[in-house]
Design a protein with these regions (language model features):
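Short, strongly patterned local motifs
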Residues: 1-18
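Nucleotide-activated donor-dependent transferases that construct or modify glycoconjugates
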Residues: 18-28
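Short glycine-rich anion-binding loops that position phosphate/pyrophosphate groups of nucleotides
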Residues: 101-104, 177-179, 301
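Short glycine-enriched loops at secondary-structure junctions
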Residues: 130-134, 239-242, 289-292
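Phosphate-binding site of ATP-dependent enzymes
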Residues: 158-159, 168-170, 178-268, 272, ...
Length: 333
């Protein structure tokens, strides 16, 4: 998914809200893709009309959240995407709204979630819930499940982090609290003369909090991404790091390998499911190394296309089925 596009809005053809069919212009689908391309294509086949917005397209008039949105149509032939002319309207006129904004979590994101929280959710199903997105930092949310995670310390103190490194036996991973795609993640070894320099840079000389976590040697076998829908695992992909890396993220060269959802993975999902549902975090990606949960990705989880390709499945069907059921519950249809 491109970080350019932040929202996907969905309306069925039999809805009261209609799309403009004129003034289309062509764009590269990599910029226009607001969620996995397969999901958008699948919705089109079911007769849904798809629109997209970016953060700057949102605004509030009176007490009504509104936005400037554009119709999106994907095609197999070139050009791969057509985007309609912009038009304005109330967000709750859509049947569903899906927020897909990559980290970092900045003030623009923060205020967008407040605006989206004003949508009448008896009229429009919003996924994930704006309040849940606002409160669920992707690094810190996992700390709500201390029995499922490796030993962890969050601090801005270099001395405290170094003491923790020693306590862990001299190896540790540190990561920023607002990063994504493996950016800013470092492996620390107590014997490395660069350790102090890395901590200085990572903490901005003690002014920025970071997460320190026990190094898990199982990372050599891969970092597993589990796609979770409404608390249930849909599928998983293993991201195996390069020999020279400690990060399995695809952005830094990790190779996607077929894997299974294990009984331990199901245990993790069952442990998280009640809180995920309570927070309205219906579509998430869990990162698991060995038997430990390391992150809960809630803003823009990826992995559907990789699981589809490796397992010859179509996970987007399950996601769209779920959204359709939520909309039907709202409308009573």
């Amino acid at each position: 998914m491109s970080g350019e596009t932040n929202f996907i809005a969905d309306v069925r053809h039999n809805s009261h809200h209609r799309a403009e069919q004129k003034d289309h212009h062509e764009v590269d689908h990599k910029r226009a893709e607001p969620s996995p391309k397969s999901s958008v294509t699948r919705r089109q086949r079911r007769g849904h009309e798809i629109y997209f917005m970016e953060l700057d397209d949102l605004y509030l008039r009176g007490g009504t959240p509104q936005g400037r949105y554009r119709r999106l149509e994907l095609a197999r032939a070139t050009p791969h995407a057509h985007v309609g002319a912009g038009r304005d309207g109330a967000l709750e006129d859509f049947d569903s709204l899906w927020m897909r904004k990559d980290p970092p979590f900045d003030l623009k994101f923060f205020f967008a979630t407040h605006l989206l929280s004003l949508i009448d959710q008896s009229k429009c199903f919003v996924m994930n819930n704006p309040k849940g997105l606002r409160e669920a930092n992707e690094k810190l949310y996992a700390l709500r499940f201390p029995e499922q995670i490796p030993q962890t310390l969050v601090s801005s103190s270099m001395e405290r982090l170094k003491a923790f490194l020693t306590q862990l036996g001299g190896e540790m991973i540190i990561k920023p609290l607002d990063g994504c795609g493996g950016s800013g993640v470092f492996y620390l070894n107590e014997q490395d003369r660069n350790t102090n320099s890395i901590l200085e840079a990572a903490t901005d000389n003690g002014r920025r909090m970071v997460m320190g976590q026990r190094y898990l040697p199982e990372i050599r076998q891969g970092d597993k991404r589990i796609i979770v829908l409404n608390g249930e695992p849909l599928g998983a992909v293993l991201r195996v790091p390069l020999e020279s890396e400690t990060r399995g993220n695809i952005h830094v060269g990790g190779q996607c390998v077929k894997t299974e959802v294990t009984p331990r993975d199901r245990e993790l999902c069952a442990a998280l499911a009640p809180l995920l549902r309570a927070d309205g975090l219906y579509f998430v990606g869990l990162d698991v190394i060995g038997s430990f949960l390391t992150e809960v990705n809630v803003t823009s989880p990826t992995g559907i296309q990789e699981v589809n390709a490796l397992d010859h499945v179509q996970l987007e069907r399950d996601v769209i089925d779920f959204v359709e059921r939520q909309v039907e519950n709202l409308t009573g249809n």
